Amino acid sequence: MGIHPLTSRCAGRTALVTGSSRGLGKAIAQRLAAEGATVALTGRTMDPDPKYQGSLRETLAEIEATGGSAIAVQADLSHTEDRERLFAEVVDRIGTPDILVNNAAVTFLRPLADFPERRVRLMMEMHVLAPLHLTQLSIPAMRERRRGWVLNVTSVGGDLPGGPPFDDFDRNAGFGVYGTVKAALNRLTKSLAAELYDDGIAVNAAAPSQPVATPGAGTLDLAKTDTEDIELITQTALELCTGDPATLTGRIAHTQPFLREIGWLS
């Protein structure tokens, strides 16, 4: 995470960030905590494990070492019961979230002709149903406060590809199901933003304009593509999780053009 001036933009607020043991979720959780939020971390990896890069305990320790406030709750968000248990524990320990960041994901890349149905269902569960369910659980308290922010972490892979002619990536990379679930998440974001607008709840999505070199990017050959600094997604997330819900909602924000639009990036 880069060095940021402390502005306390999230002081007094609580945030739930899914998939925060590593990668984008970890970086977003750290940024919100640095801005004063009390952050609930969640993911499947609670303790350090040599099979994985990062764990909830490590993220928690790093936040607390810099003076931030956080808790860690292990959960497998592919299961309805785990989502409900997670949310209940977060409410019990730090209160209902003012900010919900739906970042947890699972990715399999394979041609559609032989893509296993069980993996399609798992990706739909993680990328679409889990964000919807956690948002549904968050809505009552946000409505009562007439204030709330929901951020769905999406991907430029959710954009419709051009063609014909189709480029080599779209023909051969096996991104069909991934792009489908991210496109569905984008549509869900727009619909939630419209339905919750009168309640003062902002719902947005954010995507890196280019791949970010994190442990979660292991399926990509980053040596063959341009990458961007993780600070761009953390800044985008901060803006979308603190902006005025009357004007900053319903956005599918790609980091670089969005940050140029608001004057943060030249």
Question: What is each of the regions a protein language model found here?
Answer:
Residues 35-58:
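Conserved glycine-rich Rossmann-like NAD(P)H-binding loop of the short-chain dehydrogenase/reductase
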Residues 14, 21-22, 45:
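Conserved glycine-rich cofactor-binding loop
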Residues 32, 96, 150, 186, ...:
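Conserved Rossmann-fold SDR core element
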Residues 111-112, 119-121:
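Substrate-binding pocket helix/loop in short-chain dehydrogenase/reductase
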Residues 135-136, 190:
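A short, exposed helix-loop element centered on a Lys and neighboring polar residues
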